Amino acid sequence: MVAKGELSPQALPMNRLFPAFVAVFFAAFTLIIQSSVQADTFGTSGNEFTIDFVNIGNAGNAADTTSYGAVPYEYRASTYEISQDAITKAMASGMANVTAGAFTGNQPAADISWYEAAAFVNFLNTSTGNTAAYDLTFSSGSWSMALWSSEQAWTAGGTNLYRNKDAFYFLPSENEWYKAAYYKGGGTNAGYWLYPTASSSAPTAVASGTNAGSAVYDAVASVALVNSAGGLSPYGTMGQGGNVWEWNESAFDGSNSLASEGRTIRGGDWGNTENLLRSSFRLDWVATDEYPINGFRVASVPEPSTYALLLMTGAGVLWMTRKRR
C-alpha cells in the first residue's frame, strides 16, 4: 500500500520524466520551425512557379545597435530574391502592369519599382484566395497607393498603414528584412552579424556560387542566378548582400504614414564594395525608381501547419499535465 502523500511506483517514472519530455519536445519543435524550408506554388497551369521560404523564429528578439531588427512575431522570408521567371509566369497568369525585365530566367527580377514589387505581392495573395497586402491603383500608366485605415492596417509590432492586417504575403519591412539578414538566431538576445553571410568579416567576392561566407559583389561582371548568389544568412536566406539591391516595405523614416514617402532599400549589388553590404548601410529611394541594380524578395506569415503543430504541442503538454494529477 502506498502511504498518503507518496508517489506510486507507476507514477514515479512519469513524474521524473515529464520536465525532460517537455524540454525535448519544445526544443524539437523550435528546431523544426526555424530550420524547415517550404515551397509555395503560384500561377496557372503551364505557368506555375514556386517560391521557397525559410522560417524566421526567435520572436521578440532585441534590436541591433542600429535600432533595426526587432520583430515580435514569427514570419517567413523567401530564401532567394524573386526571379525574372517568377515575374514572367505571374504575368502569364493574370498579373498586369509589372515591367521588370533587366535580366532573364532565374536571374533576379530587376529594373522594378517598389509599386511593381508590391503588385507582385498582391498577385501572390489574391491568386491564392488571400487579401491584397497593398491598396494599389494603376491608372494612366502609373501606380499609386492609398493607406489602409487603422482598422484595416497591420498592427503586429506597431501600426503599419501600408500593409493590410489580413495579408498572407508581403514585402518585408525593414525590421523583418534586417533580422532575416543579420540576426544570429538561437535566442532573443543573440546579437547581429555585420554582413548577411553569418559573419562580421567581409564576404569573399564571387561571380556566383553557394560557398559559405561568399557574396556576389565587388565589380563582378553581372548578377548571378538567385539560387547561386553566395552563402546563407543564419536563417538560410541567400543574396541579401550583393547581387541586387532589395526593396524594403518600409518608408525610410519608418513611419509608413504617407504613401509618397521614400522607401528603404538595402543589401548592395554585384558592382558594390563590401561597405554597402553592411547592416549599417541603407538608402532612401523613390518608390517609382526602376534600375537594373534593384530587385526584391517577399515575406509571409507562418504556414497554417505551423500553428497547427503549435496547438498540437500545447494540447499534448496539457494532456500530460492532467495525467500527472
Regions found by a protein language model. Name each.
Residues 1-20:
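N-terminal secretory signal peptides that target proteins for export/translocation
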Residues 22-34:
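Bacterial N-terminal signal peptides
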Residues 35-41, 303:
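Boundary at the C-terminal end of the N-terminal hydrophobic targeting segment
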Residues 43-98, 108-125, 242:
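A short glycine-rich, aromatic-capped structural motif
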Residues 49-50, 118-278:
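Functional-site microenvironments in short loops/helix caps that host divalent-cation chemistry
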Residues 291-300:
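Short, structured beta-strand segments at or near domain termini in extracellular proteins/domains
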Residues 303-320:
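A short, hydrophobic C-terminal helix/tail in secreted or cell-surface proteins
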Residues 323-325:
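Short, charged juxtamembrane terminal tails flanking transmembrane helices
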